[in-house]
From Swiss-Prot:
Start and end residues of each stretch annotated as GPR motif: 253-255
Post-translational modification: N-glycosylated.
Subcellular location: Virion; Host endoplasmic reticulum lumen
A Gene Ontology molecular function term of the record: metal ion binding
Organism of derivation: Rotavirus A (strain RVA/Pig/United States/OSU/1977/G5P9[7])
Main location: virion
Positions of Ca(2+) 1 binding: D95, G206, S214, E216
Keywords: Calcium, Capsid protein, Disulfide bond, Glycoprotein, Host endoplasmic reticulum, Host-virus interaction, Metal-binding, Outer capsid protein, Signal, T=13 icosahedral capsid protein, Virion
Name of the protein in question: Outer capsid glycoprotein VP7
Binding residue positions for Ca(2+) 2: Q177, D228, V229, D231, D301
Amino acid sequence: MYGIEYTTVLTFLISLVFVNYILKSVTRTMDFIIYRFLLVIVVLAPLIKAQNYGINLPITGSMDTPYMNSTTSETFLTSTLCLYYPNEAATEIADTKWTETLSQLFLTKGWPTGSVYFKGYADIASFSVEPQLYCDYNIVLMKYDGNLQLDMSELAGLILNEWLCNPMDIMLYYYQQTDEANKWISMGTSCTIKVCPLNTQTLGIGCSTTDINSFETVANAEKLAITDVVDGVNHKLDVTTSTCTIRNCKKLGPRENVAVIQVGGPNILDITADPTTAPQTERMMRINWKRWWQVFYTIVDYVNQIVQVMSKRSRSLDSAAFYYRV
């Protein structure tokens, strides 16, 4: 009997010693791993400069997240500037290194080399189809053309404001606009928009819902069309869907990281008369120079003043993001 008790006690003590040994081994192993990991971090820390730069993500729904550099406070050292210009500017300048020259000049104003991007576009119409405003600050140059005043105004209204948009299924539904901030925005290679207002019995007012030829044409073969109809009235629409996409959009407010500079013209285009523009100020300016070199020199000279009336990027705009948030 005593032999059995001694054996039990001995077994218990041996088990206790064994467990203690295992725990110490595990502890030593974990300490080794942790200390090695910390050593690697300490060694690599001086070689790594953490940055939290903005990432160009497609903005959808009502997401509104600012992406900012959080490690330094310099205004321009951590910012990017995009300068959009018509291709005719590069043609007139006829210098393969003209952008490098301007980059060096921007450097004198505090913009590091590589922070300024130059992006050409063919014409107002083509730029309207695929506006890509990815930088923290975006300056769009538009040369004045008396025949394109309305196109220029529509483009300015699009890029100087933010829009929350939803798809429209015009084959199944009628649509109405609720207020002055509610517009229908169409983009594509050729957008022809026709509308037929409806009464409470869904009968056409001055048109027949079964005859699209009786519809009123509000846009004809345009690349960008911002359509405004009578609020609170249902409409049946006809759209060239094979070459155009239409969205039901709500103006949210100004897009403060975009400025438009009009080159030439007797008067600057004024889109502030729109009652949905509040406050009645816009980031639109005018430069009256005949030669493009003078235009760019002026922009370099006053770039910091221009940027001061803007706010750093909070949203990106591209053709994919347009369909939900513009």
